[in-house]
Amino acid sequence: MDSQRNLLVIALLFVSFMIWQAWEQDKNPQPQAQQTTQTTTTAAGSAADQGVPASGQGKLISVKTDVLDLTINTRGGDVEQALLPAYPKELNSTQPFQLLETSPQFIYQAQSGLTGRDGPDNPANGPRPLYNVEKDAYVLAEGQNELQVPMTYTDAAGNTFTKTFVLKRGDYAVNVNYNVQNAGEKPLEISSFGQLKQSITLPPHLDTGSSNFALHTFRGAAYSTPDEKYEKYKFDTIADNENLNISSKGGWVAMLQQYFATAWSPHNDGTNNFYTANLGNGIAAIGYKSQPVLVQPGQTGAMNSTLWVGPEIQDKMAAVAPHLDLTVDYGWLWFISQPLFKLLKWIHSFVGNWGFSIIIITFIVRGIMYPLTKAQYTSMAKMRMLQPKIQAMRERLGDDKQRISQEMMALYKAEKVNPLGGCFPLLIQMPIFLALYYMLMGSVELRQAPFALWIHDLSAQDPYYILPILMGVTMFFIQKMSPTTVTDPMQQKIMTFMPVIFTVFFLWFPSGLVLYYIVSNLVTIIQQQLIYRGLEKRGLHSREKKKS
């Protein structure tokens, strides 16, 4: 096997992976689009008592910090809209990215409240509480680091329930604190809950689609417990009424999409019930309900939780709840992508440009892999040196395949040649390549990150296809510089078109990934020359053998 055959192997592996990825994405039929409404929100089955009754009409209040622009409904105190001012909807757009939405076409809300036997959000106790607020708009002022939004409700028995949203400057974590004052003569049994609900089918204005060659990031629900650090839960599974229903101390529930997430993390010493529910009308939910607590007459009880609503910034999410940072979708190669991203982020702290950081990390990765690359080229050179002997053996033994195989293995052993020596380094490089892809597609830090000149977004494709063409040119030079023993006409034609095939593949790839591959190819050219010089001194390579 030689380096040109390696290109063919890479192509076959790559195409196979893309076919598998597409099959994974499409094997489950998507639910039919339905008109979403706000009237059916009671969870079915085992989660029935955790459902949230219809919100009805309340007043919408505005809550703004430097990084969050929330709309909260005083009926129940749900967050019905969340805008992220620091993240434009599109490149060069003045409109902020909208994470939570309540519209006739799409629903994505963060609900919370107090249920249980005496909770005001218990459907058996009537409509959801209509909270009183002091004003219609709350804004984090200059020089202010914390913003509190208190909402109060007093039931018919005189019990007072206070729900306070606490937001901090530069923070996407929102603390939701409950205060229950029992004015009656009997204990109040109260449970807190947090629920995320979302339309399963994306409307046209949100479903941007993707090219056939792009990897898809996960969109759906997820949860974490002390026993299961991170588990995804597909919307399709919820739509089929195969729902989650587990108890856990600690943990969180979340809904995920590319770059952004929402999550509820309860703060209590008791047990929480984690559940999913098909709410009907094409809406799925995931949530938690806490273990009931008793608030004695004349006493005050407190319960707390945290809502994350924003970008998937790993270090900040990890500070909110254990393992919440795992929601960044790096796919099945997360164990490679995560350390690569940490290294990339460390490099970026010095150079200040994600594109140059990718270039530097490419040199680092290829430098670490240089011994494997050298072993690969040495193994291929030895295989080329044995070709005359192997050809003579084939002519001597004719069609006796068994004897040919036996004598070839004996020859490899005598010459200390591993026939698979050229494949192993290739198998090591492929997961790293794919892990980099997952990292670029899943890291919000690279979303709309500029590089230089015409590359204004490293997570998007090159608008002028210059980088893919340059990548194809570097592949062409590598191919021309590499010795070959390929004699089959069909294989020769395939080898000739490999740079073109790869260029077409990479037209739709993120610019950051294409940049990595260009730099990696340039490093290959340099390393190739250094290795060939060493092989020439050992008599394992001759420039006359190169195919021009």
Swiss-Prot record:
PANTHER family assigned to the protein according to its UniProt record, in alphabetical order: CYTOCHROME C OXIDASE ASSEMBLY PROTEIN COX18, MITOCHONDRIAL (PTHR12428:SF65), OXA1 (PTHR12428)
Assigned GO CC terms: plasma membrane
Subunit structure: Interacts with the Sec translocase complex via SecD. Specifically interacts with transmembrane segments of nascent integral membrane proteins during membrane integration.
One GO process term, biological-process aspect: protein insertion into membrane
Compositionally biased spans, kind Low complexity: 30-50
Membrane topology summary: Multi-pass membrane protein
Region Disordered, annotated ranges: 28-55
Name recorded for this polypeptide: Membrane protein insertase YidC
NCBIfam families referenced in this protein's UniProt entry, alphabetically: PRK01318.1-1, PRK01318.1-3, PRK01318.1-4, yidC_nterm, yidC_oxa1_cterm
Chain segments annotated as transmembrane: 6-26, 350-370, 420-440, 458-478, 499-519
Organism: Shigella dysenteriae serotype 1 (strain Sd197)
GO molecular function: membrane insertase activity
Family statement drawn from the similarity comment of this UniProt entry: Belongs to the OXA1/ALB3/YidC family. Type 1 subfamily.
Role, per record: Required for the insertion and/or proper folding and/or complex formation of integral membrane proteins into the membrane. Involved in integration of membrane proteins that insert both dependently and independently of the Sec translocase complex, as well as at least some lipoproteins. Aids folding of multispanning membrane proteins.
UniProt KW keywords: Cell inner membrane, Cell membrane, Chaperone, Membrane, Protein transport, Transmembrane, Transmembrane helix, Transport
Localization annotation: Cell inner membrane
